[in-house]
Amino acid sequence: AVARFFEATGKLFREGSTQSVAKAITKAVFENEQGQAQRLQTSSSVEHGQMLFKDANLKTPSDVLNAFAKLDSKMVKSHAAELSQLAERAMTEVMLETDSGKKLKALIGDDAVKSLAVRVVKDYGGGVAAAQKNPEVRINQMQAVFDMEVMHLKAAQRHIEGLASTDLNQGVYAEGLPEDAFNKVGVTNNVERAAAWIINASNSKGNDAENITSLLKEYATNGKDLLNMDNLKELHARLVPNVERDYRGPNISGGTLPSSIGGEGMLKQHIEGFLKENPVADKDLGKHLFAGVIGYHGFTDGNGRMGRMLYAIAELRNDSFNPLAMNAENSLHGIK
């Protein structure tokens, strides 16, 4: 292929005009798989668009999206996959610079908002067809999705952080579940009681009682920091193995749950930031962890089990276990 390239360009230099030589070299370099690979490795949609559309006047991601209106059917067909990636890339970059994107970034951080923007654009961006027709319409629709996410995250944050100034040892927060409601066989060991409570409260089928009991025993004494997101992720992976999905999108149909990406970002900031900057009593830590995990819903599955597991571990580390009643649970996590 390289030899044919030099043979062809050599002939053009000998026999062709300067314009035809330049055009042929440009085509040889950029209109092949190697050229495509180069474009896909560029640092931005603008650089990618300039190379693909051969237009140095493209200065912003919006310029790139507007350039799609000029594409002919031949170009769309011959570069379908690359154009799809470019459209999504440009839309993602536009979304990050909107007011909605900036508000979300302030809540969950740069990496999380970028990850969420990529997912939202894949779900709602409309790809090449939308970019050709009217990309502004799709951008506005996706901003509405971001705005809903911000609203849900802020509502959860107000409730969960508000618990730090609440006495969790009185009223509904102190309501316990009657022993016979979850401890069917009458075990007396606190680890086994905690395992029975977790299993009884879970809606998931096939909970592994042996695994839950083993994790409770291990974490009750291993001293691992429960205000560390990596430690929580490790525990969750062992508690809820074989999770089938890796993403839950923003709720736009009337519910209040945030996306899994937004929820994870908020949970990380809550345990590694808020709770460390606003330390709570050891006897209350389990309730705060329970509220944060379930209220922010940062995992795609098993948030209830994880929240109860952390509550139980915190209790066991204090040589006790007081099973929460449903009213107490609902008041702690605040999900409507």
Model-derived regions: residue spans:
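Hydrophobic, membrane-inserting alpha-helical segments
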Residues: A1-R4
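FIC/Doc superfamily catalytic core
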Residues: G10, Q38, T42-S45, G49-Q50, ...
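Low-complexity, charge- and small-residue-enriched intrinsically disordered regions
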Residues: G10-A24, A28-N32
